[in-house]
Amino acid sequence: MFLVGLTGGIASGKSSVIQVFQQLGCAVIDVDVIARHVVQPGYPAHRRIVEAFGTEVLLENGDIDRKVLGDLIFNQPDRRQLLNSITHPEIRKEMMKETFKYFLRGYRYVILDIPLLFETKKLLKYMKHTVVVYCDRDTQLARLMKRNNLNREDAEARINAQLPLKDKARMANHVLDNSGEWSLTRRQAILLHAKLERSMEYLPLRLGFLTGLAGIASLLYLLTRYLLPSP
């Protein structure tokens, strides 16, 4: 099995493309969902965040107040690094758990929905393939203005706050162009899925896993046969 990192930009259509892959039966892990999950009360990251930033980051129900925490680390590289050192290891552990579940169920590849895949670069080394859902800037701007009911200035500010889609497209292995008709984008996603399904890149890990199981089985057999007392 291998990992596919999928990303996009605001109003590029990433969520719609993810739905296509899910309809095709693909395994999809949303890293944002995991990031929210690991900071819930009762989890180690929650306790460490409170220890590091104080109870002022808590809501009345004990959840992390994401806005307050965001304000605390805004333009504070040291604090942001501290928060990342708390949350990123927990996120990676949960990702590994979810990925292993899909591995055991026989999936050839798993898609990781990672909004900041190229910005942080923390997870890039784990990805066999990277995919960007792209659209040209004019289309992105028009969609964002319509979707969020924004004026041009506000919409441009939000787009400019992100790494440009054209830059992400240059760094990706695969680009799904969502600038035109949705039917064309959907077809691109279907063709990419077929290509990834045909890939043999899943074999090394699966063969290694099976070899390991065979080794354990052989060891257990030898222990049973030669070390345990006969009845």
UniProtKB/Swiss-Prot annotation:
Using the record's annotation, list all stretches that form the DPCK domain.
3-207
Q: Which Pfam families match?
A: CoaE
Keywords of the record = ATP-binding, Nucleotide-binding
What InterPro entries does its record include?
A: Depp_CoAkinase, P-loop_NTPase
Keyword Nucleotide-binding among UniProt keywords: yes
Q: Name one GO biological process term.
A: coenzyme A biosynthetic process
Annotated ATP binding lies at G8, G9, I10, A11, S12, G13, K14, S15
Spell out the GO cellular component terms annotated for this protein, sorted alphabetically and separated by semicolons. mitochondrion
Q: Could you say which residues form the signal peptide?
A: none
Please verify whether the record's keywords include ATP-binding: yes
Tell me the GO molecular function terms. Answer: ATP binding; dephospho-CoA kinase activity
Q: Which NCBIfam families match?
A: dephospho-CoA kinase
Entry's family note: Belongs to the CoaE family.
Name recorded for this polypeptide:
Dephospho-CoA kinase domain-containing protein
